[in-house]
Amino acid sequence: MCKVKMKVCEGQYLRSSVTLESRQLLDLQVGKSVLALFKASAATVSKDKTEDVSRCFLFGQVSRLPQKDKGGEVTLRLPNGLNVVGFIRGNHGLEVGSEAYIQIPEQSVVIALLG
């Protein structure tokens, strides 16, 4: 297995674990542009960043969320304008415009080639 670190925006990265064979088949090299995918149901949105080394954290601003007393899908806009979606539990205390973190387990991040 090898770890792949992908820059999402300034100071924010996603990590993934791939087999050596996958690394070779994808011809992964430093500086190569790739597409990183994860299911929204694998990502958790929260107001605070927890210290969990097995997860990647991205920081952004809430642009869409469910009612405060209900959980559901939340969209965060990252500083570079990208939108990412994750889930949050009910009674979350966030509002549109709030700053929040999305936590993604590195084993949930899949790498694909562009084009």
Regions found by a protein language model. Name each.
Residues 6-10, 38-40, 78, 104:
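Flexible glycine-/small-residue-rich
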Residues 12-18, 37, 82-89:
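A short macromolecule-binding patch
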Residues 20-65, 70, 90-115:
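Glycine/charge-rich catalytic "coupling/switch" loops of P-loop NTPases
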Residues 4, 14, 43, 74, ...:
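A broad, low-specificity signal marking well-ordered, structured residues that form hydrophobic/aromatic
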